[in-house]
Amino acid sequence: MMNVRNLASVALALLLGGCANELRIDTSHPSANYDSRVQFIVLHYTAASLDRSLALLTHGEVSAHYLIGDGPATVYRLADERYRTWHAGESEWDGRTWLNSSSIGIEIVNPGFHDTPTGRVWYPYSEAQVKALLALLKNISTRYRIDPRYIVGHSDIAPLRKLDPGPLFPWQRLAQAGFGRWPDARAVSRARQRFDTSLPAIGWYQEQLAKAGYAIERTGELDVTTRHVLAAFQMHYRPARFDGEPDAETAAMLQVVAGMR
């Protein structure tokens, strides 16, 4: 039998052997060739109260990095920006798909809409919420150098299944602050002069929508998908009417927005 001294020697040898095999990583040659995971900011409404929104986003099957409350427009951070949250789902923008992995999700407490016998009623955002959102966008965009084209709504990246943040969302005000795009009214007016005379073919609308960032197939047909994508574009840039019809005003706005690269 081994005595105590021999047992101690064996234990020491095993310990030293383990140390000798320990993984050592040399960090003296860092690469400059990388960028941030975060390329997009996706904006949503919750279609729920604050309490319900917090419960859904922290214990449900969806999540976001930030939530802006109502009443006092408190900004809640629900997840570290290093992590992927589950807010975008099946999505695409400018050729990039499944944006959960490359975006920061911001939810805003807002009921969304309700349907009445006379039509759908949408809910506005409060001034406090808009100011809180602008401050948050400035903070995030500055740190990650987000391209204004990549600040989008859920309806932009998933137009077949989502309507948020809705037609009352203040996209123009965000764009004026540098967060997003908004077409110059004079440029739209000039472009419309041509389209008032003759509308372009459906394939042209599809091509311009793709240039603007929307996921759409060039079928040349006014199919269900094309109507949904047109409606998403209209809801973003012409919220007074978003019926998915390829009219002259839509063509003019689309031409200008698609050219804002």
Stretches found by the model and what they are:
Residues 146-161:
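Acidic/histidine-rich, metal-coordinating catalytic segments
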Residues 195-257:
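Short acidic, glycine/serine/threonine-rich helix-capping segments at coil-helix boundaries
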Residues 1-8:
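Bacterial N-terminal signal peptides that target proteins for export
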Residues 17-18:
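C-terminal motif of bacterial Sec signal peptides marking the signal peptidase cleavage site
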Residues 61, 70, 128-139, 169, ...:
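Extracytoplasmic/secreted proteins, especially bacterial periplasmic and envelope-associated proteins
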Residues 33, 67, 167-190:
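Acidic, His- and aromatic-enriched active-site or binding-groove loops in soluble protein domains
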Residues 21-149:
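Active-site-adjacent loop/helix surface patches within enzyme catalytic domains
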Residues 92-95, 117-128, 158-161, 191-198, ...:
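Second-shell loop/turn segments in exported
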